[in-house]
């Protein structure tokens, strides 16, 4: 069923004279030969993506022209499909919700206070709704990363690549040669009570370096890193950095490097840890090195590096195949397929995907679901084999995540 080009709410926005905030920056990007435009909030670092039709409206917002005039002008001059009134209303709401829009109307004090109140209670509300996955912002690392990003810029050139290969490649051969020793009775080694204490101390440090890798790469290509904090996944502290501004980087290969920077950092750490593990006698240093290898190796191969899970590998794949929001679009595509062909809903609206995109979406979503289920159940059974109660708690908690 086609959507009406007219909106019952048009009267509330038609007379507004909007313009973008001064800290909003527009960039042109190309995905699969089709132009898109990103609007980056330089104050907060977030990036929003819009179609060509939406961009033509946004670019014409000068603070003097009414929304109705902008819409009429777009419909009278556009050779392509212009935005409908409901789409314009949605666009204005999205820009307003992101604090990117300024209008000629005086601010509503009550509405502003209500918005601040909702924002203040947003984090506690998320904690109450999902106590197994808490996110606590701690500080703004942008100034720190800006100060040191220039000193580390060589890491993203030939010298950095050569150093990484010189350290990692020999370590890979040594790992193969010592594989039996490294993996002997692995689960008992990892889940022993003494090793778990060491792992709890090592894990946050390794993951902090992982996240700083993303942050330095983002700063190297002109992005902003406005937030560093702790995310408690099933009560385990995991550092994170907010690098959504990297999605405004025009080159898809540079965006992919930003997504891969954390894994490259961990692999480098794992290689150094292997050398330490081979050189020192059994003791604290060897235990720490072993845990660095386990954390970096397992997380890279099984979790972060796999595009079927929504971690680093996922963003690398989405950037390289030029399908942003791959998971969400895959879910929308499969919802359409099930509605249209499974339940015979002939009025189901087909998502606006090309033939090549629909092939990726058709394959990706079921593969991701199967792999995610396999990894989740495998981890639960592995932990439950050593600590039954913890395994049960993990299984129950995943129902809520």
Which residues does each PLM region occupy?
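Eukaryotic partner-binding/assembly regions in large regulatory complexes
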Residues: 1-26
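Long, charge-rich, low-complexity alpha-helical segments
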Residues: 2-9, 32-36, 42-155
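Core alpha-helical transmembrane segments of integral membrane proteins
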Residues: 122-228, 272-277, 283-286, 294
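Select subsegments of transmembrane alpha-helices in polytopic membrane proteins
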Residues: 158-165, 258-267, 360-372
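Membrane-embedded catalytic scaffold of the fatty acid hydroxylase/desaturase
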Residues: 191-357
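Transmembrane helix-loop junctions at the membrane interface of multipass transporters and ion channels
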Residues: 271-286, 370-392
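Conserved small/polar residues in nucleotide/adenosyl-binding loops
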Residues: 399-401
């Amino acid at each position: 069923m086609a959507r009406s080009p007219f909106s019952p709410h048009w009267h509330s926005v038609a007379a507004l004279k909007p313009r973008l905030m001064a800290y909003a920056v527009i960039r042109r990007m190309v995905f699969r030969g089709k132009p898109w435009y990103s609007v980056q909030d330089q104050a907060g670092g977030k990036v929003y993506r819009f179609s060509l039709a939406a961009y033509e409206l946004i670019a014409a917002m000068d603070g003097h022209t009414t929304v109705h005039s902008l819409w009429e002008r777009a419909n009278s001059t556009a050779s392509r499909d212009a935005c409908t009134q409901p789409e314009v209303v949605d666009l204005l709401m999205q820009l307003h919700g992101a604090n990117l829009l300024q209008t000629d109307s005086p601010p509503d004090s009550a509405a502003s206070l209500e918005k601040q109140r909702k924002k203040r209670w947003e984090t506690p509300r998320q904690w109450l709704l999902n106590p197994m996955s808490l996110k606590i912002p701690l500080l703004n690392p942008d100034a720190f990363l800006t100060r040191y990003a220039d000193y580390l810029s060589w890491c993203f050139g030939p010298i950095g690549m050569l150093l990484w290969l010189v350290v990692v490649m020999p370590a890979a051969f040594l790992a193969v040669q010592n594989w039996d020793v490294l993996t002997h009775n692995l689960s008992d080694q990892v889940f022993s009570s003494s090793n778990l204490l060491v792992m709890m101390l090592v894990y946050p440090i390794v993951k902090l370096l992982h996240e700083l890798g993303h942050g330095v790469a983002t700063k190297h290509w002109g992005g902003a890193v406005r937030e560093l904090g702790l995310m408690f996944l099933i009560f385990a502290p995991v550092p994170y950095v907010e690098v959504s501004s990297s999605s405004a980087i025009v080159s898809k290969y540079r965006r992919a490097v930003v997504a891969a920077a954390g894994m490259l950092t961990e692999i480098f750490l794992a290689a150094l840890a292997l050398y330490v593990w081979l050189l020192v006698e059994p003791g604290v240093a060897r235990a720490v090195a072993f845990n660095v290898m386990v954390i970096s190796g397992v997380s890279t191969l099984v979790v972060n590096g796999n595009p079927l899970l929504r971690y680093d590998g996922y963003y690398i794949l989405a950037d390289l195949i030029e399908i942003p929001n791959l998971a969400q679009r895959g879910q929308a595509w499969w919802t359409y397929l099930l509605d249209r062909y499974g339940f015979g809903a002939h009025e189901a609206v087909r998502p606006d995907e090309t033939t090549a995109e629909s092939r990726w979406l058709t394959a990706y979503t079921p593969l991701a679901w199967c792999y995610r289920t396999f990894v989740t159940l495998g981890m639960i059974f592995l932990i439950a084999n050593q600590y039954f109660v913890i395994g049960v708690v993990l299984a129950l908690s995943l129902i809520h995540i």
